[in-house]
């Protein structure tokens, strides 16, 4: 079995560093790079792109609300036309830096509050995904399980890599538990490893309430800002390899 292992990276800003990106990039097959709105800046984007190219891992745009102070995790009420332009702006920024480095963007994902809102609202997901398709009809959408995003992508003939968030708790609708709720972020390496093993063995995840629900995933995501992210990534890799899995960049899984 082949599966992608990806992480959200490049989420520092200026002199401020977030996460251990260099170590994480040695362990993953695809990187989701902040594009300057919820985090990141041109120099961080450039160095992350060049490191991804050197390691041969897939490069993805991680687009979010214009909310540096809130790290893109606060809901914002923005006119839909403007929000679509914000998404395209971020895609263009990373694609430009990648082109200058002789590399390319293979996939994108919606960050934080924007991702949660789009996953739960077809009227929001449709226009946002359409904006992505207009930018690049070959772009892969990387998303946690979401009927809204998957149907929008299908309507635009875009491929979707459904993602399992190894360090986040799920509810019984297979949506992410809000971060403000106790237990929403999974930090224990053994617990993360067990969750990944369960996913690979029977395609399920145990929800915060203790119920098993089915999860369809081609990719496993780890947040770079989760405490102990490097140790968690090693645990995930070990679990995948222990189950006979092969870690593979998302574009190779979906034939980009």
Swiss-Prot record:
**SUPFAM superfamilies of this UniProt entry?**
Glycoside hydrolase/deacetylase
Q: What does this protein do?
A: Catalyzes the cleavage of 5-oxoproline to form L-glutamate coupled to the hydrolysis of ATP to ADP and inorganic phosphate.
List the CDD domains.
LamB_YcsF_like
- A molecular function GO annotation: 5-oxoprolinase (ATP-hydrolyzing) activity
Which keywords does this Swiss-Prot/TrEMBL entry list?
A: ATP-binding, Hydrolase, Nucleotide-binding
Q: Which gene encodes it?
A: pxpA1
Task: Extract the Gene3D superfamilies matched here.
Answer: Glycoside hydrolase/deacetylase
This chain's source organism reads Pseudomonas syringae pv. tomato (strain ATCC BAA-871 / DC3000)
In which family does this protein belong, per the annotation? Belongs to the LamB/PxpA family.
Q: What is its EC number?
A: 3.5.2.9
Pfam families reported in the protein's UniProt record: LamB_YcsF
Q: What name has this protein been given in UniProt?
A: 5-oxoprolinase subunit A 1
Question: Subunit structure, per the record?
Answer: Forms a complex composed of PxpA, PxpB and PxpC.
Name the reaction it catalyses.
5-oxo-L-proline + ATP + 2 H2O = L-glutamate + ADP + phosphate + H(+)
Q: InterPro entries from the entry?
A: Glyco_hydro/deAcase_b/a-brl, LamB/YcsF/PxpA-like
Superkingdom of this protein's organism: Bacteria
Task: Name its GO BP terms in alphabetical order.
Answer: carbohydrate metabolic process
């Amino acid at each position: 079995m082949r599966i992608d292992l990806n992480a959200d990276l490049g989420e520092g800003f200026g002199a401020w560093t977030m996460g251990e990106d260099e170590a994480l990039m040695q362990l993953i097959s695809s990187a989701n790079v902040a594009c300057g709105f919820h985090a990141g800046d041109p120099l961080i984007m450039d160095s992350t792109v060049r490191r991804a190219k050197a390691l041969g891992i897939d490069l993805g745009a991680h687009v979010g609300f214009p909310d540096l102070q809130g790290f893109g995790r606060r809901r914002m009420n923005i006119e839909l036309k403007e929000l679509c332009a914000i998404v395209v702006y971020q895609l263009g920024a990373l694609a430009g830096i990648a082109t200058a480095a002789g590399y390319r963007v293979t996939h994108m994902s919606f960050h934080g509050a924007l991702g949660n809102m789009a996953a739960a609202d077809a009227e929001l997901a449709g226009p946002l995904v359409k904006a992505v398709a207009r930018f690049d009809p070959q772009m892969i959408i990387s998303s946690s399980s979401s009927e809204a995003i998957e149907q929008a992508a299908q309507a635009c003939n875009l491929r979707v890599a459904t993602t399992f968030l190894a360090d986040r708790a799920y509810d019984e609708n297979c949506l992410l538990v809000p971060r403000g709720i106790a237990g929403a972020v999974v930090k224990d390496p053994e617990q993360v490893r067990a969750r990944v093993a369960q996913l690979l063995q029977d395609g399920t995840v145990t929800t915060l309430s203790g119920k098993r629900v089915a999860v369809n995933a081609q990719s496993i995501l780890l947040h770079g800002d989760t405490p102990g992210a490097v140790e968690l990534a090693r645990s995930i890799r070990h679990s995948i390899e222990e189950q006979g899995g092969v870690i593979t960049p998302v574009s190779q899984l979906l034939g980009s």
